[in-house]
């Protein structure tokens, strides 16, 4: 039996820990409380083929289309073909998906050709999944270290052999035969985000400092509809799937003139259209209009969104709800194979922090929870396989804790590296990504990680002199005929 350290307690980390604990000693490290993760806030659901009128081939094609020519087909085929088994595993762990009679209830979301989105508690899918998996982990032979932040990966030679963590104000070392990063994204890079406070890119930053290869970092998905109110509460795609429409400040529906699928166009299209409309109307938000829909259906299907609206003096069923794009999901991350292996022996990555190429330039709605389960299952199996010899990596760098004005950093990233970008804005944002060396604390560690991630994102965005998917360059608005991926500063052709 070997020791495996899993970092992160969202869907990918919890599933990896559960399955790995059957054969290994597992230590689960999480920066906050175990239930505190982006998974908990996921509303729309999990996409998988579970009906006779759907097929894996259709799910594959929908995913490839959304990915704008940059998806790894092999990764997409794994995701979609293993999706039904992933759903079955969640059911076995006690996730209570909503039912329509005796059958699973299935919703429709943007860019899906079939109704295949499973949800739980209406719009509380992520919370239901997180609660079930936390219960299962608590009952499994897993050592859980809450409020414990990863400082650096330990790599004295070619391989990663442990983690240094910040716990109760002190740095401790945890030795490991394998480290699995499942730390999610870095939405806190931006002033508008749907991500929780813990999403500061800790795993990716540690991997970059350790010399791991990353890919697709220019592709950050901005969800089209977060409440344009304090807190940035996500308003799920599923509301538009039920028939809600978007209106500008003049009350005009505008998406019909943008894309044949109107409000159900791919996320990058809708987010960009909203951002452009907001610019035209002096920064005022656009509005989501669900007033023509059945109030009882809205209340049952979207209890969390309805409650968030009420908390702000609004009614989802009776009012125009102000919305804005917000940073939501990072398609890029630590480059891995289909079994979670990174370029460093002993280091694995899974979920949002990883990049298998499954999402390409733009993630299909509700594929992220599925990704977390499918690739966690594969990663847990791969822990038993001897890692192949890897090419020597650059020497690892220790973190330099930083004190900085986080709000200024977030505003600069939103303005220069947000929904739309150009070389001037990207270079301007880069000048803000600095801070003063400071004593190690959770805050200065997070700030250093945000700077590390922000610099990597900007370098990748500057390297891609085209517009594709979620990466929109106003100074390079066209999409090149040949698809390529940016890995570090290298451009790598995407096989057809």
How would you label these PLM feature ranges?
Residues 32-64, 68, 224, 236:
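Conserved N-terminal glycine-rich FAD pyrophosphate-binding loop of Rossmann-like flavoproteins
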Residues 1-3, 19, 25, 33-34, ...:
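Glycine- and aromatic-enriched mobile tails/lids
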Residues 71-84, 117-135, 145, 193-201, ...:
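Short beta-strand to alpha-helix junction loop
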Residues 34, 206, 212-321, 373, ...:
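An anion/pyrophosphate-binding glycine-rich loop and adjacent beta-alpha core
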Residues 93-171, 182, 223-227:
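Conserved redox-cofactor binding core of oxidoreductases
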Residues 4-28:
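N-terminal Rossmann-like FAD-binding beta1-loop-alpha1 element of flavoenzymes
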């Amino acid at each position: 039996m070997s020791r495996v350290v899993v970092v992160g307690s969202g869907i990918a980390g919890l599933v990896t820990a559960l399955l790995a604990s059957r054969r290994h000693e597992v230590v689960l490290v999480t920066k906050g409380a175990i239930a505190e993760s982006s998974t908990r806030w996921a509303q729309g659901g999990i996409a998988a083929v579970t009906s006779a009128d759907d097929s894996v081939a259709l799910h594959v094609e929908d995913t490839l289309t959304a990915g704008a020519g940059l998806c790894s087909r092999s990764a997409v085929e794994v995701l979609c073909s293993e999706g039904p088994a992933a759903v079955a595993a969640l059911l076995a762990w006690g996730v209570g998906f909503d039912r329509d009679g005796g059958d699973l209830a299935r919703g429709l979301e943007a860019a899906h050709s079939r109704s295949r989105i499973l949800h739980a508690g209406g719009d509380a899918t992520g919370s239901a999944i997180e609660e079930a998996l936390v219960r299962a982990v608590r009952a499994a032979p897993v050592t859980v270290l809450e409020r414990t932040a990863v400082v650096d990966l330990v790599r004295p030679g070619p391989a990663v052999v442990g983690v240094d963590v910040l716990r109760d104000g002190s740095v401790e070392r945890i030795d490991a035969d394998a480290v699995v990063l499942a730390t999610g994204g870095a939405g806190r890079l931006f002033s508008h985000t749907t991500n929780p406070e813990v999403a500061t890119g800790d795993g990716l930053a540690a991997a970059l400092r350790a010399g791991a290869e990353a890919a697709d970092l220019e592709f950050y998905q901005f969800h089209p509809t977060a409440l344009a109110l304090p807190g940035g509460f996500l308003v799920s795609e599923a509301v538009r799937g039920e028939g809600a429409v978007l209106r500008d400040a003049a009350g005009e529906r505008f998406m019909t003139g943008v894309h044949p699928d109107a409000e159900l166009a791919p996320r990058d299209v809708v987010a960009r259209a909203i951002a452009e409309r907001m610019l035209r109307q002096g920064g005022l938000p656009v509005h989501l209009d669900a007033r023509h829909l059945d109030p009882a259906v809205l209340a049952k299907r979207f209890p969390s969104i309805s409650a968030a609206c009420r908390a702000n003096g609004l009614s989802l069923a009776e009012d125009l709800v102000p919305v804005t794009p917000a940073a939501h999901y990072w398609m890029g991350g630590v480059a891995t194979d289909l079994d979670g292996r990174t370029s460093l022996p002993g280091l694995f990555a899974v979920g949002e922090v990883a990049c298998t190429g499954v999402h390409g330039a733009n993630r299909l709605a509700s594929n992220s929870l599925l990704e977390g389960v499918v690739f966690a299952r594969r990663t847990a199996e791969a822990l038993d396989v001897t890692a192949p010899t890897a090419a020597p990596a650059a020497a690892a760098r220790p973190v330099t804790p930083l004190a900085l004005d986080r709000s200024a950093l977030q505003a600069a990233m939103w303005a220069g590296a947000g929904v739309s970008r150009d070389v001037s804005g990207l270079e301007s944002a880069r000048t803000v990504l600095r801070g003063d060396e400071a004593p190690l604390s959770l805050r200065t560690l997070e700030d250093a990680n945000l700077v590390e991630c922000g610099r990597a994102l900007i370098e990748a965005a500057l390297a891609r002199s085209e517009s594709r998917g979620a990466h929109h360059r106003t100074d390079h608005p066209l999409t090149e005929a040949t698809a390529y991926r940016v890995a570090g500063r290298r451009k790598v052709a995407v096989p057809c």
